[in-house]
Every structure is written in structure tokens, then in C-alpha cells.
Amino acid sequence: MKRNIAIVAGGDTSEIVVSLRSAQGIYSFIDKEKYNLYIVEMEGRRWEVQLQDGSKTPVDRNDFSFMNGAEKVVFDFAYITIHGTPGEDGRLQGYFDMIRIPYSCCGVLAAAITYDKFVCNQYLKAFGVRISESLLLRQGQAVSDEDVVEKIGLPCFIKPNLGGSSFGVTKVKTREQIQPAIAKAFSEAEEVMIEAFMGGTELTCGCYKTKEKSVVFPLTEVVTHNEFFDYDAKYNGQVDEITPARISEELTRRVQTLTSAIYDILGCSGIIRVDYIITEGEKINLLEVNTTPGMTATSFIPQQVRAAGLDIKDVMTDIIENKF
């Protein structure tokens, strides 16, 4: 009998549009001969399943099921592709743990750590991972322009500490830009991270592990036409994404080894993607860890899967079957 798979998308942040795109990508990637697929949209208290006829029906949160006519359908597995809360920060994972439904990605702790950029960086720094200098501001806290310049320097990045897709991010070059950038970041999240700029080559590396194997994908080099890898660059084509990256085999191996180590340190599950900046002297610096990476047809992970000579359908099957 086919397993019923929920592709869980939506969320309560600006990234909802990106999440819904990823859901369509995942729907196209998963083997429909093996699984019954349904997209489940979550937004606030609205949890709905998309039916084949285009209509939507509510999800019963008691057991994560829905009624399809007179038939009750209970999901066997959740593929979480919510970028942002509640799917990337551990909240939804806690719900699925409580009702004992397996899911595609990291558990509560790893998701919560990686969703908080500042906490994740400080945690991994303790294991010897290189990170940039940064400051954290919480709602109600303030920092002077002088302190930013003295402690972090210019240029710097001011961004929401929670969230992704570069919403609310500003590359700050002058003192006059600091406070407006902080206000912009606070409009997206309750915490703001002020991070030192690092110039160099931007790379990203995907990885997943199962009970039987460990797979680290070829690296992608990210060359943006904009000031930085912002929303336009990510989703409107203002970037060159080169897979495999134009770097030495030795540096490739080092980045892949570090990615695998970060996966294990954090206790990850499913597919993750780790972003880096390579600075002078081939120093590998962590940017961030993504535990629910984008999965549209043109996203980094599908590109890397193709470059590795793998079939994305087989990768999706690995992720699902590893939980049974």
C-alpha cells in the first residue's frame, strides 16, 4: 500500500511565497508510483489539504488527517518545506513528535538552533568553525552608530536574526544607514543581527545522511550581480550559480568535510545546505545553516543533485524511507 505523504508548506513569515514554490518542486520530485502526495498549506490556524480537483479541505490537528469525501486519510509522513516559522524553527517538528508522525528534516533542537543565526554561529564557533564578528539586538535594545563602527566595522550586514530569503537584510556602508537598517530588520523579526562583512567567494554545499549512507553534494559557487545575494538575486535571476564551483579539489574536499561535520555536530536529519564565504588564504567561514533549503526546480539542492549524477526522485525516496 502506498504511504500518504504530506508536503507541508506555507508558514507565518514573508517566506510563504518561497515555501509554496518549494512545495510544487517537491511534488514534482517525489515518486508518485510509490507515494500518494498531498500539499498541505499552513498559515496561522488555517491548515488545509489541496485536493486533486483544486478544492481544499481542513486538516484535523488531532491526528494530522483529513476527510476526502467519506474516506478518512491519515498521513504517514510529512515533508516539511516551510521556510521560517513554524516549520524551520522546531515548532512543527515538536507537534509531529507528539503525534508520532515521521518527518523529513531536523528535529526540534537542531531546527531551533539553526533558525537562530546568532545562536547557531556561537554554538558552532565552540567547535572551531570560523564565523564573522557579530552583535545581537533584541526588541527594545539599541546600539549607537559608534559602537557598530567600533565593534563590527563598515561595511556590515544588518539583518533579522530569525528568517531567511534575505528579507529585511541591508548591506550598510555608511553610519547614516545603520539605524534605518536596524529598523528595517526589526520589521521582519524581534531580533536583529549586525554582522561584519567578509569579502570573498560565496559557496554553498548540500548534504544528507541515512542509516546506510552519507551524501555530500558538489559545491555551488554563487556570483551575484547585486550588492549581495538578496531576494532579487535569489529569485529573480540576478545571480550566476556555478555547479560545481570553480575551486580546487582540495578546497572542495575541505568544504565538503566541514559540511558533513556540521551535520553531525548539530544532529541534523534530511537534507541541509550550508553557506560559506571563502576569504583570503582559502579560509572557510560559515554564513549559515539551512535545514529546510529551497526545493524549486532551480534551487541549489536540485542543481547539486544533478551535478552529482543522482536522480532527485531517488534522493527524495531516501529521505522518506530513512524514517521507516
Curated annotation (Swiss-Prot):
PANTHER family: D-ALANINE--D-ALANINE LIGASE (PTHR23132), D-ALANINE--D-ALANINE LIGASE B (PTHR23132:SF23). Cell wall formation. It catalyses: 2 D-alanine + ATP = D-alanyl-D-alanine + ADP + phosphate + H(+). Pathway: Cell wall biogenesis; peptidoglycan biosynthesis. This is D-alanine--D-alanine ligase. It comes from the Bacteria. Belongs to the D-alanine--D-alanine ligase family. It is found in: Cytoplasm. It is an enzyme of class 6 (ligase). Residues 121-321 form the ATP-grasp domain. The lineage of its organism: Bacteria, Pseudomonadati, Bacteroidota, Bacteroidia, Bacteroidales. Binds 2 magnesium or manganese ions per subunit. Keywords: ATP-binding, Cell shape, Cell wall biogenesis/degradation, Cytoplasm, Ligase, Magnesium, Manganese, Metal-binding, Nucleotide-binding, Peptidoglycan synthesis. Gene3D superfamilies: 3.40.50.20, ATP-grasp fold, A domain, ATP-grasp fold, B domain. Mg(2+) 1 binds at residues 275, 288. InterPro entries: ATP-grasp (IPR011761), ATP_grasp_subdomain_1 (IPR013815), D-Ala_lig_Van_CS (IPR000291), D_ala_D_ala (IPR005905), Dala_Dala_lig_C (IPR011095), Dala_Dala_lig_N (IPR011127), PreATP-grasp_dom_sf (IPR016185). GO terms for cellular component: cytoplasm. Its EC number is 6.3.2.4.
